[in-house]
């Protein structure tokens, strides 16, 4: 009788061990907290505090890979392949960029806080194909432990009329936080969006 009980207990332990191993070998589902599939830019004219919100739906998210973007303004007004942000010459604007996970429309997660918490591992870079706009970190921006601005909040100063293509990147683990082009920063790309800035 005791031998039988001992055998059953041993068999049960083996079964539980095998089940545990199977669970460990099963790949974990993608963590929803790592998904960044929507970017929002709020543009505020510093002279009168008027603002406009621009939404960019990112179709795919994959470190270091190209992915498609569907740009939309607040009124779903699309201009060709790019969203157009209208700016006045000789003016100053505040650009606030945020990153969301809207996989579940009923539970939209603001991922910007996670980016801030990992500020040493992230950097926002705007690459402009043209002249007429100067960009700098602005009040309310996040500064990393080395004194580098994250560029979540920036001031755009316009000068002359221009139509400028803009690419905005959220860079993960950049090797440098200074540069003029995306390649200067190294690391991988968490998010990439495109729009046109029209200065008139």
Give residue spans per PLM region.
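Intrinsic disorder/low-structure terminal segments
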Residues: 1, 6, 53-55
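First exposed extracellular module after export/assembly in secreted or surface-exposed proteins
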Residues: 30-200
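Bacterial Sec-dependent N-terminal signal peptides
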Residues: 2-4, 14-41
